[in-house]
């Protein structure tokens, strides 16, 4: 995949546009538009977003097409958008319509792929990616690469989503680094905030545990 990722994925926007163009002239209620947006339009990019991080600009352009369709805009005649798109993406119980925020949905799908790598270590999927992209560390420590595939770098975006909420559950503590890993039982900040002790940069939580107690 070349540097211009937006051009590589532009076919998704074109498919969405063609779908919406076919419906614009029809007299649809808001209930009808809601069903079409959720069941058809927002389903179009789902497969691709499961494996690749789409450019934010492309997501915004697709959402712009959907917004105009939702408010009944035809051609160049602009119509007032009475509610912000962010509000429409909220659950209905919170005053929204339950539409998908495409960028957030993309991140969630990629996080699912990262979760597969973490929990299916006997799979061919894991073995191939492990050997090629993180042979000497875990996926938690793996780094994005300018020479790596876009699929791999996309999975790392999903990994970063998991990192925001992931916590180590301490057993023996041999694999948990004191200073870098999230292991403290705190909801606000699970990482150690004090300065790193010189000479103990790679200290493990197991070093803090007295085996006799």
Model-predicted segments: where are they?
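A helix-boundary/hinge signal
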Residues: 1-213
């Amino acid at each position: 995949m070349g540097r211009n990722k937006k051009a590589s994925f532009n076919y998704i926007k074109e498919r969405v546009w063609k779908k919406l163009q076919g419906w614009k002239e029809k007299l649809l209620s808001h209930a009808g538009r809601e069903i079409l947006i959720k069941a058809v339009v927002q389903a179009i990019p789902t497969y691709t977003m499961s494996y690749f991080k789409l450019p934010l600009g492309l997501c915004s352009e697709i959402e712009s097409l959907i917004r105009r369709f939702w408010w009944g805009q035809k051609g160049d005649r602009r119509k007032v958008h009475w509610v912000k798109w962010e509000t429409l993406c909220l659950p209905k119980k919170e005053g929204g319509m339950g539409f998908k925020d495409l960028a957030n949905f993309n991140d969630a799908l990629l996080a699912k792929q990262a979760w597969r790598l973490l929990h299916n270590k006997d799979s061919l999927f894991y073995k191939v990616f492990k050997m090629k992209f993180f042979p000497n560390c875990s996926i938690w420590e793996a780094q994005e690469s300018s020479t790596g595939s876009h699929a791999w770098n996309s999975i790392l975006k999903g990994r970063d989503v998991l990192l925001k909420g992931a916590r180590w559950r301490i057993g023996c503590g041999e694999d948990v680094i004191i200073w870098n890993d999230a292991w403290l039982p705190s909801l606000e900040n699970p990482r150690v905030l004090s300065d790193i002790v010189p000479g103990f940069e790679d200290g493990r939580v197991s070093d803090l545990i007295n085996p006799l107690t």
